[in-house]
């Protein structure tokens, strides 16, 4: 298994898919920058490329939460958890969700809630994309010069907006709340809510 790297926040995973009837080419890049932090807390890993034809390929990105202790360790541990269980059963993607739930519970028990990370995992199998995400790390699809956000940021502000729409308080309070930018979901909580594909996304030549 390929081990995750341990370098810088605001990293970007770029996956380019070129397909035709006879060929399937996959390019993966990991671009990172430490920003204004003193320590890199990202982790990134991919499954073995030589098993792409049979098992597909899995790319995992985790961003340790800089405001909490042990963010880097948790990010590396989460990437390793998914890669060590790859290849996943096909097409039972529900098993992957259960794996992530198990992973976050173990991390919660290990660190007692004093740390966490975001997660984006993309599994390309043939010409189809499955993904799972927790937190606010983004997954984008670039298709024919148009950029599409595939996942939803899980931030506390969205919960506040829903409550304001239900009449709990004025909508202005959802934007002024000091916790608005905090994560509502992250790996390291005892229980998490996933954003994921329920139906795989078909990929086309030139998709990135």
Predicted feature locations:
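PP2C/PPM-type serine/threonine phosphatase catalytic domain
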Residues: 1-208
């Amino acid at each position: 298994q390929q081990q995750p790297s341990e370098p810088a926040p605001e990293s970007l995973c770029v996956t380019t898919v070129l397909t035709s009837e006879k060929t399937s080419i996959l390019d993966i890049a990991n671009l990172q920058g430490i920003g204004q932090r003193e320590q890199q807390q990202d982790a990134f890993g991919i499954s073995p490329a030589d098993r792409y034809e049979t098992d597909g390929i899995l790319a995992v990105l985790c961003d340790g939460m800089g405001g909490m202790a042990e963010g880097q360790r948790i990010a590396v541990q989460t990437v390793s958890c998914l890669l060590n269980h790859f290849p996943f059963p096909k097409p039972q993607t529900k098993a992957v969700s259960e794996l992530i739930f198990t992973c976050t519970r173990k991390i919660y028990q290990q660190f007692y809630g004093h740390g966490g990370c975001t997660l984006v995992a993309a599994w390309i199998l043939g010409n189809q994309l499955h993904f799972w995400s927790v937190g606010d790390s983004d997954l984008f699809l670039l298709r024919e010069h148009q950029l599409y956000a595939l996942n939803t940021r899980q931030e506390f502000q969205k919960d506040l907006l829903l409550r304001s729409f239900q009449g709990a308080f004025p909508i202005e309070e959802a934007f002024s709340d000091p916790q608005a930018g905090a994560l509502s979901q992250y790996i390291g909580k005892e229980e998490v809510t996933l954003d994921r594909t329920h139906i795989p996304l078909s990929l086309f030549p030139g998709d990135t």
